[in-house]
């Protein structure tokens, strides 16, 4: 199931690695207060699934997604935990078919024209582009979108406050993912005042 409608009005999605699930709800509330209404919690920590469930149950105003999806079982698990969308750095046949069976809004990853075309043929018009900067950033996206104008991208990886407006200025970019405004160190220190300040700044610079 394509995730375009779900993320169409979102400019920036915080990509969070939550190592302590007890910080999840406070982080979500802080982001909401800063004007951010969606979050991608990556499955890169032992507490990730619990964090997704806590945010889904305690902060219903926040659209919560799960990132770094690699296996079919993970799609089933995040759905049970309350995730509203899923993001993967790539795509496999089993992931695509399972996401469709579960009616889970899914952002599969693509990095080449062939991968993009394959996903378009599966009905996915919003695709993750990762790692964005390492793959050539905005220049690569411009080149890929020239012969493939229908596709839209959700680039993540290496995007900074300085680069964010350049990505969002591209017609082919629906939203970007970033973690520069939710540093892991500040999250572990529970410095939500500083995270709110940085998140508000992120909202300001991404309203291009």
Regions found by a protein language model. Name each.
Residues 27, 71-81, 114-122, 159-174:
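Catalytic cores of alpha/beta
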Residues 146-208:
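Hydrophobic secondary-structure block in the mid-to-C-terminal portion of proteins
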């Amino acid at each position: 199931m394509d995730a375009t409608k779900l993320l169409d009005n979102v400019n920036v999605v915080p990509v969070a690695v939550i190592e302590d699930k007890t910080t999840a709800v406070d982080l979500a509330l802080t982001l909401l207060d800063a004007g951010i209404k969606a979050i991608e919690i990556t499955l890169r920590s032992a507490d990730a699934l619990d964090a997704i469930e806590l945010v889904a149950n305690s902060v219903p105003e926040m659209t919560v997604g799960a990132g770094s999806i690699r296996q079919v079982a993970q799609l089933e698990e995040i759905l049970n935990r309350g995730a509203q969308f899923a993001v993967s750095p790539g795509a496999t046949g089993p992931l695509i078919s399972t996401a469709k069976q579960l009616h889970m809004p899914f952002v599969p990853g693509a990095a080449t024209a062939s991968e993009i075309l394959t996903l378009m043929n599966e009905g996915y018009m919003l695709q993750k582009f990762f790692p964005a900067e390492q793959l050539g950033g905005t220049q690569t996206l411009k080149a890929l979108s020239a012969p493939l104008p229908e596709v839209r991208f959700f680039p993540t990886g290496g995007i900074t406050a300085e680069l964010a407006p350049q990505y969002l200025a591209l017609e082919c970019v629906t939203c970007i993912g970033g973690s520069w405004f939710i540093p892991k160190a500040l999250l572990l220190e529970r410095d939500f005042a500083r995270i709110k300040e940085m998140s508000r700044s992120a909202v300001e610079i991404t309203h291009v």
